[in-house]
Amino acid sequence: MKPYPFSAIVGHDRLRLALLLCAVRPEIGGALIRGEKGTAKSTAVRGLAALLSVATGSTETGLVELPLGATEDRVVGSLDLQRVMRDGEHAFSPGLLARAHGGVLYVDEVNLLHDHLVDILLDAAAMGRVHVERDGISHSHEARFVLIGTMNPEEGELRPQLLDRFGLTVDVQASRDIDVRVQVIRRRMAYEADPDAFVARYADADAELAHRIAAARATVDDVVLGDNELRRIAALCAAFDVDGMRADLVVARTAAAHAAWRGVRTVEEQDIRAAAELALPHRRRRDPFDDHGIDRDQLDEALALASVDPEPEPDPPGGGQSANEPASQPNSRSKSTEPGAPSSMGDDPPRPASPRLRSSPRPSAPPSKIFRTRALRVPGVGTGAPGRRSRARNASGSVVAAAEVSDPDAHGLHLFATLLAAGERAFGAGPLRPWPDDVRRAIREGREGNLVIFVVDASGSMAARDRMAAVSGATLSLLRDAYQRRDKVAVITFRQHEATLLLSPTSSAHIAGRRLARFSTGGKTPLAEGLLAARALIIREKVRDRARRPLVVVLTDGRATAGPDPLGRSRTAAAGLVAEGAAAVVVDCETSYVRLGLAAQLARQLGAPVVRLEQLHADYLVHAVRGVA
């Protein structure tokens, strides 16, 4: 079936513009599209690939999709097994990056892709080449492609270190306008009823877009980006307080691409504005609880400030310019194929400080107190070591060594080491024929994350609201750190006769803030149900990611009162958590004068430390969780 025409997409003007600008100038660094399900993200990317094939006049140019389960050797390439086994030759087999050369590399749900693969993709997109040093191979080849990633923020954030590497970002959502939604339905149903007729109806519009892409690609290097425009871009990025210089370069390249797309040869303010709206939103976000996007009023103010000429420096004492000094020449416009590059290698003269924007009001704070936490540090390297900043032996990381078949740390076949062993045994004897003794397995290292599950007593036996305020603050604080890594946090509450999954495992602070804003309290204490729900969640998440280590934080007084034999069932449920290998922390919420010590008994059954209710400040709880990690 032919792809849905790009020109037939209803609305999403900013999304379409971002994709077109990336097609005009791939050096921008690609685009990240964030949005809820069913917002034409994938449809737009496939339509762009079809346009690019026409614009470049290449039948080989097209769309290459990178599946989430792809391995590093499939992405960058590896040993050509067929030629090695048949001819005994040491040959390279290209990967997906080589196939994407000249076209579009599309990664759906890029936030769920392994971090080291995202690093490889972004490096290749920025450099335009792939360097392979693995399996005894040293190889380099061109890989110039338009990198497009899509993601649903509800499924977790992309680490800021990786987010900054994408040139442009666009947030999309379905229109709430009834007429627009009706038009979307009509066009989609017409396409599904007769794809060929529908594509033919928009063929002329798509052909015009392809022609504009080709024309812009041919002229973008000739677009003039003058000194005044460069100063305006630099002042704009400084005003928004972005880190590093990547934002300045991306805005400059995008502004030039936008000017070429409009068919003009000089970058103007409207080009800089369009570029800033696409290149700055994800770079100015400093906190996981900040809103996405960029404030138009702030952008207008920044552009206005950037347009003001700096005040001239006062003449030095003793007079002005001497008679024999040449008169200063006005700034001249010059072509630049690398916008934002310095004009000289010498020391820059002192310049007035860039104006800062007035602070915009922050959105209302999430429930409870949010605070900064220390990063999780786990000493040593070994199986199960948690934390995305901690190296750990696992079955899905990068290959770091080879081992004998009997090594328990090895996972899967290490192809090159196996062939090397066979070659050493039968050197010069023709085609390789590995024997069982030649087989080597791969030792992999990756970065593992935690799954922190808060199991909270929301019954009416004591101050449930105070407990939830503390757990809300601790959860959001852990998510602040999870924003830097890929830790996940979940919250289970139990009251009356059941347990409720209040917050599904997430690393999205936005989702957590909304879900933790409301909760119900009161009723009996079904402790066993809460522990059983935590175990069920751990089992379910292990199917998705076996490397993620579960940590359970139980906030209760231990006074189970719901159901038959509540204390006995609680002990059985605790034993089930231990059997799943979950580490735990118990927060003793008992406040009565006569203490029964039931929470301490539960802690002994879980093999967990105990934190007193009097110590239940959110930052203390966070440090307790990190202590058992």
Swiss-Prot record:
Family: Belongs to the Mg-chelatase subunits D/I family.
Positions of region (Disordered): 308-395
A Pfam family matched in the record: AAA_lid_2
Cited SUPFAM superfamilies: P-loop containing nucleoside triphosphate hydrolases, vWA-like
Organism the protein comes from: Mycobacterium tuberculosis (strain ATCC 25618 / H37Rv)
Keyword Cell membrane applies: no
VWFA domain location: 451-587
Keywords: Acetylation
Official protein name in the record: Uncharacterized protein Rv2850c
